[in-house]
Every structure is written in structure tokens, then in C-alpha cells.
Amino acid sequence: MKNDLSFEVVVIGGGHAGCEAAAASARLGINTALFTHKIETIGEMSCNPAIGGLGKGHLVRELDALDGVMGDVADKSGIQFRLLNRSRGPAVQGPRTQSDRSLYRKYMQEKLLNYCNLSVFSDPVIKFIFNKNTISGFETNSGKKILCGKLILTTGTFLNGLIHIGDERTPAGRFNEKPSTGLSEQLEKYDFKIGRLKTGTPPRLDARTIKYDNLEEQFADEDPYFFSFLTKKNLNKQISCRMTYTNEKVHKIIQKNLKRSAMYSGSIQGVGPRYCPSIEDKIVKFADKDRHQIYLEPEGLNDHTIYPNGISTSLPEDVQQEICNNISGLENVKIIRPGYAIEYDYIDPRELFLTLETKKIQNLYLAGQINGTTGYEEAAAQGLIAGINAALSFKKQEPFILDRSDAYIGVMIDDLVTKGVAEPYRMFTSRAEYRLSLRADNADQRLTNKGIEIGLISKEREDIFKDKEKKLGIISKIMGESLISPTKIKSFNIKIAKDGILRKSNEILTQKGVNMKKIREIWPEIPYFDKKIDEQIEINAHYRGYLKKQKADILAFKRDENLVIPENVNYDDLSGLSNEVKAKFNQIKPKTMGQALRIDGITPAAVYILLSHVKRKSIKLIA
């Protein structure tokens, strides 16, 4: 064995979870190492060349508010910025960008390879080192023995990964890249519940062989909505995407060849993502539809590769070619690389604490697709939380937990560790009970101070954030003191009830058609700082009434939700609970009443029995 190396925190895996985990740990001043198969694939976008979207964009803004790396890299590599749901309210709008795949990888690598407190190694891990129920290090392919205080495992689709193209099966973690083998089997010895999930990707097409003439064009937004609160301007030329559709002939080709699909031949055992189905699944499950939309997304400014979003498949390559050649615009298209399905191991996330440390092995943290999620953004958000908590734990500080009213990150992690997954988990705005307050626009106001408190935030970001808060405070104070009567406001063509009650300017701002420009016509003493500050004031005013009620709901809920469940509760002795409920409580061991309530299959009645028991015990202790 070669000379030992020792680090305080080690991250295994250089995907989106691994990048955020390593960066977060390093930002907290911890001597951190990142181990990956290849340094040149750090930050690789394995599937679609895009970041963000509905729910996902919120996660990236929250990552950025906590000084994560994904938002900045997405902005620097963005080649088509679009704000989804722009016509709807800010609570459900989703920032998204098409990224240049090579630029994204380049900027992520530049960032991490120059990150303070972070060392990066290209050396696959082959064996963990355990000391009873504690992980203490690992051995690498080159024969190195690495010791660590905390270990974060972010293997993505590499854990016993298996690629399917028709009846061909190839062990791989990604196209032309070897999987991680043997690691699952080591964890299995500690009775981890390990399952198989599946995801897929479409064939890559040669843009030079596509006829674009009659295809609908989708343009970038003229006024880009960036992911990072620090980004001031767009760096890249903005491009268009094109749209085309499947048709009845294509559907017949797929139906005729279903048995040749790995999905329908019985080759694949893993469950795929419901919200990102293969084209085979679409044809079978939505047989009434005569066409399905396909977005032709360029993979880069200097790249001829097109990602046809909407036709993920595990059909044989010859069938993929036939399908493509019967789609409008793709009649003569050349496939650069076939689409495929990939199966991989995941660990039941109910095996984790909210810190993402495993319950069965101390000092071992899991983040990303190994926890049953799908998507770059979901992985990155978990990486951030695992990295923060591994570092804080090493420093013997309190854990960093975001709850469901704090962030979409908190919603996701709570869902994972309490409910587990039956299919790859994807974030949506509908998953958040408090989505009116968990908006993309206010992620910094919700989270940056929390990051400052634990030493996670850079001086640059802290200064910019505090300056923004100061400006918002100045305007809010003046507007809270500026009053006007219904009679006087009428002269400005603003209609309100003639009830003689004076209104504050922030109340007037909630009226239809009123913006900050109009407000300054009435109160010219209100200072103007910049467009972003005005937009934030307008959004805050719009949601003011709703948020006041929601805040009361959150406080009421938290009174019982945050009630801690003693570790010594004997669920088997609680009368009124079914054996199934007792088994779930014993398996998950919820820390709080709120966590108990969100366990899949647990009824409010069962939680009430537990709540009554905990409160009775508390009263006895006080007495």
C-alpha cells in the first residue's frame, strides 16, 4: 500500500452533487479532497444541456444564495435564458438556461481546481475502510490508502451502472465510462436497503443534417433572468431552439419494435422517472395522443451536436435511426450517438438523517442520485447540504437543517428521508406547501443570512447581500410612512374605495397597474437604486397579504411540528397504532412530529396518538 493521505472531508464523485459537496466543505475552511474517475469529466452534463426549470430553478437560486457553484457556472455557460411561466406569478416562475456543455464543464473545472482548501484527484475508489460502524477511509485503484474524518458518496449513475441499447447491455456509469463496482456490495453488508432505478437519454443528432426551414423557433428571453444573484451580464451569444413532433408513422414504428426496447423486453428491472418518460412509454401510456413534442436543443455554440429533448429511448440503434428519419426536419439526420437507458443502484434515502449522514454508518454521507433523485439540480442541492453538514460535524458544530418553510432544498430532503422514493424523485413547485414564500426572487433573503451565520458565505457575496438589504430597508421604511387619502389618489387615476381611510404607499403598490414608477410620481422622495430593487419591492408588496396569513400558518404548524420525539420512545407499546405504522416509525425513527407526519402511509390519527404520548411524557418530566 502506498503512503497514506489524510483529509478532514473527502467527496467521492465529480458530478453535480460532488462539486457542490466539495465546494461547500472547503468554503467552511475544511481540508477537503474530491476523488473522481477523470478530472476532465468534472461537471459533465450527462443528459440534457440545461439547468433549471420549474421547481429546479428554485433549487439553483437557493444554492446560489448559499454561495454554491452551480448558479454562477450556469450563468457563465448559458446560451438560451428563459423564465418559464413568465405570465404567471413569481411563486411558480422557473428560471432555466440552455448551457453550452463544454463551457459548463470548463467553468466548473476552473472553479474547483482553484478552490481554496480543496484538492482534486483522478483515482477511482475500489474499497471502503470501516472501523466497526464508522467509515474511516478507502483504497483507490492506484493503491493509495486515503484516511478521512467524513466521507461523502456522490456516485450518480455509476454505482453498478448498466447501459441498455436494445438487447445490448454494457456495464457503464455513463456512455464510454466505466461504472463503480463493488461499493454497493460493501454497503449491503451493513443492511442498507439497496434498489435499482433507471433513467434514459435520447440519441444525439448532427445539426448539419437537420432541415430547419419549416420548424418552429423558440427564442431566448430578451431580458435574461440569471441564476446567480452576483451575475450582472450575459457572457455568451444567445441561440434559438427548434421544435418538431412525432407522428402516427413514428408511433407505428415504435409499437412494431416495442419488444426490441430494453424497457419492454424485460431486460430492465429499475423504475424510471415518471415525469421524464421514454418515447416508448409515451406511445404506450398516452396512446390517444397523435403526436409528441420534441425540442431540438443545441449542445454548444461551437458544437454540431443536437439534443432532441423528448425522445429518450432504449430501442436498438437501427430503430432509433428509422424513428428520427420519419420526423419532420430529421428526414436526413445523422445520429452521432445512440440513445440509451441506464440502470444503477440507489440506497433508500430513509436510511439517512436530515443531515444526509447515514443512520447505520457514522461519518458517511450520501448525496445525489444515490439517494433516488433525478436531475442535476436535485443532486447539487443534496451535495451542498451533505458538504455543509460533514464540515460542521467535523468541527463539532450544530447541523445545518433547512425545513419545509425555509427552502425547496428543505422540502426535497424532508420528502426523501421521511417518505423514501418509489421512482426517481424530481422537484416541482407543487411539492412545497409554502411556495408563496419560497420564490426564486427571494432565495437570498431567505437563506444568505443563514449561510453567513455558519461562515459559508464569501465576503463579496455578504457585502452585496447586505447592500441590497440596506436599500430594500430604506425604501420599505419610507413607503411604510408615506400616506395618501382616497380623494387625493384619485387624481393619479388609481381606483380605491372611497372610505376616507389613509393608505400607505406599499398598499397602493398592490393595486392593479401600479408599479414603482407610478409610486414615485406620487412620492418622488422615494429613492431609485436599480431595476432589481424595484422589482423586489413590487413582488414583496404583491404577496404581502398572502404571506402574513402564511406566516401565521407556519408558526402554528411549527409549534407541534418542531416538537422533538424522544429517542427512547417505544413505538411497539403505543396502543392504537397498527403494526404497519409501528414498523415505519421503528424504521425511520422520526426526530420531530412534523417528520413523523410526512412519512408515507402515516395517517394524521397515528401522529395524534404519538403527539399525545410525547406531550404526556413531557408533562411528567416537568412535574
Curated annotation (Swiss-Prot):
Location of this chain's protein in the cell: Cytoplasm
Any Pfam family hit: GIDA
Residues the record lists as binding FAD: 13-18, 125, 180, 369
GO biological process, any: tRNA wobble uridine modification
Gene3D superfamilies: FAD/NAD(P)-binding domain (3.50.50.60), GidA associated domain, C-terminal subdomain (1.10.150.570), tRNA uridine 5-carboxymethylaminomethyl modification enzyme MnmG/GidA (1.10.10.1800)
Entry GO CC: cytoplasm
Residue stretches in coiled coil: none
Main location (coarse class): cytoplasm
Any one GO molecular function term: flavin adenine dinucleotide binding
InterPro entries per record: FAD/NAD-bd_sf, GIDA_C_N, MnmG, MnmG-rel, MnmG-rel_CS, MnmG_C, MnmG_C_subdom, MnmG_C_subdom_sf
Binding site for NAD(+): 272-286
Protein keywords: Cytoplasm, FAD, Flavoprotein, NAD, tRNA processing
Cofactor(s) listed in the protein's UniProt record: FAD
Database matches in PROSITE patterns: GIDA_1 (PS01280), GIDA_2 (PS01281)
Similarity comment: Belongs to the MnmG family.
PANTHER family on file: GLUCOSE INHIBITED DIVISION PROTEIN A, PROTEIN MTO1 HOMOLOG, MITOCHONDRIAL
Subunit: Homodimer. Heterotetramer of two MnmE and two MnmG subunits.
Protein function: NAD-binding protein involved in the addition of a carboxymethylaminomethyl (cmnm) group at the wobble position (U34) of certain tRNAs, forming tRNA-cmnm(5)s(2)U34.
Protein name: tRNA uridine 5-carboxymethylaminomethyl modification enzyme MnmG
Lineage: Bacteria, Pseudomonadati, Pseudomonadota, Alphaproteobacteria, Candidatus Pelagibacterales
Gene this chain is encoded by: mnmG
